[in-house]
Amino acid sequence: MDEDGDKWIRPRENTVEALVYGMNECDGIELDLRLSKDNRLVLHHDSKTEFGDYPECLSLDELPDYVEPIEDLLEQKDFIRRWTEEGAFTCFEFKSPHPSSGKAGGWFNAKERENHMMKMIEELNEILDPIDFSESSTVIYSFEPKIISASKKVKTKLKFSRLRPHIRSWGNWTSQRIVATPSFILNSLPRLMDKQRRENSPMLPCSLQYLKGIESNLSLGRTVGLEGKKLQRLTKYRKGYPVYVWPSKSNSERMLLDAGLTGLTDDLAPTSVTLESGHARWTKPATQPLTKEQRVDLDGTPIEQHFSKVNEMKKEVTPWHELTEKERINFISSWKKKWSWDREINALMKETSASSLPWEAPRIIGHRGTGKSHKNGSS
């Protein structure tokens, strides 16, 4: 049920409806893009449509109706307002074609994979050119290793990052992770941060497995986490470097935010107002930030009152774009101190305005809009 008592039905992932909803309900969204046969960027995650076709082998007109072009999303005023005026964030994930599709060089031609990434960058660059979004509000990332080299061969102001470890574009959830396991073991989270920094990537997307659970102890090298000395080690090593973590579940969301990290959530149901930790849930820590007093007030609310309290505070708490300059400076200064951000306050404030936040700001991001809704478990 939502605030009006109506039953909420989650929109299909990566649809315009899901992405607009997610953008309005949290600090931003992540979406997946593929390049159709007629060079249109379309919203779709899986390597095949639900009818078994490779999206890259079909034109936009031939694709199923549920596969929408990115232009349809960018025509939505609510989406654009949140992104360009209210500090919300957009993560564009580029998907590589399945090698058996025959596109992007098939199984062996790495040069063609790079060319495919270049074509996607060029198309997105042209589509986004008329939109006035801040530099720190957008990133393009991909599991395709050639994304970084491709970005250097295209004239663009967009920022790029790699998803690591490399999850292949072929296989099912199990086989993809079996192939990626050696890379996971050989690369601790600090080592991944070093690689991202060397590539001048503005952030690091990573799996929760690096930070929580048995798997977090498997990586060689210095391990980090969300509690105790592991958290202290993470904060000290990170120095504010942005880390975006998926999945951000009910049992980890508050820990991620308290660590100064960004979480990608698959749950934005209106009734999801209580986390497993017992805390009331707040899905706009960046674009509608709580003061210390407001956080104490919300944390002190009995569980049975979470729904009404959260909805009440959504109406009362001042959103980022309506804060005074002094209030924004206070938030940035407080966050810098709390999480040991390395960059000087002047550099942070250059990225800070009514319509933007610095890269370091922790957020809640809607994964594929309102969450994944297909069987394949990859991000």
Predicted feature descriptions by range:
Residues 1-379:
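Phosphate-group recognition and catalysis centered on beta-loop-alpha active-site segments
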